[in-house]
């Protein structure tokens, strides 16, 4: 499988996972997890708040080591594992902590994937970035 095909597959799986999970996460927290509206807001606020620190950390690590694709793979796997933990978190505090853990990894996947994609496509100029992401 070529690098371009791997990129297309990554973006397909990643965007499908985002589209399946995030539109319903807030609904799940409010209806099935039994959180109040304020608690749902607090849990969902973990994503951007933790992302403020996590994105620069993972980006710096990837740039410093020069192993962007390896860091991207590790962060993506950890984000998937953290997402699985959400199914075992019951109550406000466990869901808050589990969502913060998810955010620690998940919020860095998109920026790193964009960086890796553009670096790969730079060497193979025949493919447009939009095609890889679609």
Give each language-model segment a name.
Residues 1-48:
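Helix-loop boundary and gating motifs at the non-cytosolic
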Residues 2-4, 87-99:
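Helix-loop junctions at membrane interfaces in 12-TM secondary transporters
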Residues 16, 20, 88, 92, ...:
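Hydrophobic transmembrane alpha-helices of Major Facilitator Superfamily
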Residues 18, 48-55, 106:
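Residue-level signal for conserved functional micro-sites within the alpha-helical transmembrane segments
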Residues 34, 66, 88-90:
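Helix-breaking motifs and short loop linkers at transmembrane-helix boundaries and internal kinks
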Residues 53-67:
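Helix-to-loop junctions at the C-terminal end of transmembrane segments
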Residues 70-84:
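Structural signature of the two symmetry-related core transmembrane helices
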Residues 100-133:
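Cytoplasmic helix-loop-helix junction between adjacent transmembrane helices
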